[in-house]
Amino acid sequence: MQTDNNCIVIFGASGDLTHRKLIPALYNLYKIGRLSENFSVLGVARSDLNDETFREKMREALIHNEETTPETLDAFCSHLYYQAVNTSDAQDYGKLVPRLDDLHDKYQTCGNTFYYMSTPPSLYGVIPECLAAHGLNTEEYGWKRIIVEKPFGYDEKTAQTLDVQIHRFFEEHQIYRIDHYLGKETVQNLLVLRFSNGWFEPLWNRNFIDYVEITGAESIGVEERGGYYDGSGAMRDMFQNHLLQVLAMVAMEPPAIINANSMRDEVAKVMHSLRPLTSEDMENNLVLGQYTAAEINGKMEKGYLEEKGVPANSRTETYIALRCEIENWRWAGVPFYVRTGKRLPARVTEIVIHFKTTPHPVFSQNAPENKLIIRIQPDEAISMRFGLKKPGAGFEAKEVSMDFRYADLAGAQVLTAYERLLLDAMKGDATLFARTDAVHAAWKFVQPILDYKANGGRIHEYEAGTWGPVAADKLIAKQGKVWRKPSGLMKKKV
């Protein structure tokens, strides 16, 4: 199914996200025939470029990042245009009116437009107001949608303020708050796994699940983003958005139907059901960390405080581990252990569902644990671990696995996260985009952690290349549990 004819306006078109993610995603959608031929992309930034210069820059980015053919590349780039605008000056937005009028006429888009704010967060409240000053937000002539990148706010208060600013000029149905984790195939498949298989859903509750682990690990440090990262930290960069959204997908109730309202209703219910964090939780169920210099694979890697752009006395966390609970009928008493960090041993995001053991150990006190491992990235996969008899005499149980890898699906056309989400936005499907009530509930949940850190809460050190502070191991060990150390789930079929 192709999209409506439309014009895609990218604010921040000279930035890294546009070059690495947005234009490649649009190119691939075009290449596989998912975009209508009647579409245009208008790049907007302060840089003084013209259409041809912009096309050449995007062409270079595509050749560098994607598999291209000259014919498809030329055809796609012919849809790219550019307009220099001072994005902080409302009057300058008047330049967009004749450009968009021309593009709507040329591509017969009926006025359909979506705006992508690939800009610093400081402009998230400015751009909608400036668009509205020239009538570019109204839906009298075609639909108008606006995509907001994370972070949506800096804390609970600023998120509320930003919401008010945007809602002055765009209605909720026009606003698409993007979280690229929700565009990943395995996250979506989690819902199908749960709600289309009769053998999982009856077990998906406090009666059969012992605890849940969610890990979002990055092997790199802050790279060249030290200045930006120091203002966000692991809490704002990963935990409040990506990992809480994944947690909600694991814990949500079955929606009445698969559409934007029903799905997002259930996500919001989970966010509102998270047990509020107390001062006792700050001491017993939370670990914040910061990586220090260490040798990794024979190379000495910098500690966080030595990274470019990071103040020497920074208390920004590069690691967080939290034990949280959901106060509802399904999950009462089941701990969710969530962790994320930079400079860990591997880049991996996965969910581990730990099922309870049998009531009585018939075969062995050390029988294998039943686990369902859902790998979100890299190498998207699902693995079920359980016990079977070890060959030979006796009845010793041995762990075996049943595995599924997306890469093994012959001919599978798996869209990247940005491809899927851009396609959904053009179709008007907001199912995988965050809604305002869930965003505010997530900020409300994490606000005590932000306050704890601001008031001098402890930041534990951990060596780069390790799985985080020792305190994080002690946190989960309090209940006799250990963090799974992610490794390759399964070997590739040959």
Swiss-Prot record:
Pathway: Carbohydrate degradation; pentose phosphate pathway; D-ribulose 5-phosphate from D-glucose 6-phosphate (oxidative stage): step 1/3. Substrate binds at H180, K184, E218, D237, K342. One of its GO terms (molecular function) is NADP binding. Its EC number is 1.1.1.49. Pfam families: G6PD_C, G6PD_N. It is an enzyme of class 1 (oxidoreductase). The active site is at H242 (proton acceptor). NADP(+) binds at R46, K150. One of its GO terms (biological process) is glucose metabolic process. One of its GO terms (cellular component) is cytosol. It catalyses: D-glucose 6-phosphate + NADP(+) = 6-phospho-D-glucono-1,5-lactone + NADPH + H(+). Belongs to the glucose-6-phosphate dehydrogenase family. This is Glucose-6-phosphate 1-dehydrogenase. The gene is zwf.
